[in-house]
Amino acid sequence: FLRYTIIMKENYYTTRNLKDNEKISELLEKQLPPFCFDYFLGIESLTSCQTRLKYAYDLCIFFDFLCRKKYPKKAPLDLTLEDLEAVTNNDIELFLSYLSGYRYNGKILTCDAPAKSRKLSAVRAMFKYFFNKGDIEVNNAAKVATPKCREKEIIRLNENEVSELLSVAESGRGLTRHAIGYHDK
């Protein structure tokens, strides 16, 4: 049984990674500038497939923003490393502001502080990669402050709730039919 479980997990992750890599390839072909191919190749051994996919989605939004606001006569696929190097920290701050309410793929979207922070992380990682390689001379993304995220309050059970939870877990009373099936295992 354990061997079967391990094989199933491997198949799940392998299948998921294959699908994610296909999505990344599609984004590289259809929505991202050509220099992004080098970037994603360069970070492949350093990041998980899921991270790269999220970065690809976030960079699509970033390059769409650049083409709308800074390079209106260009499409994302036409951008060059010279265009990237010309992006200022002010441009990136405008991007973060833009994320408060923007149109992408025909939808109106918004981002909260954690989402803005993640998108900034994707942009910073890309700038850092090209800066470290010597392809750009200035890493302006490093100059941009990270959006402040509110700390979430820790939710705790009171003594009665803990007691009730343990009682239900031990006895199974009050569970749905579906939950009872798991409880009986």
Across the structure, where does each feature detected by a protein language model lie?
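Conserved catalytic core of the tyrosine transesterase superfamily
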Residues: 4-185
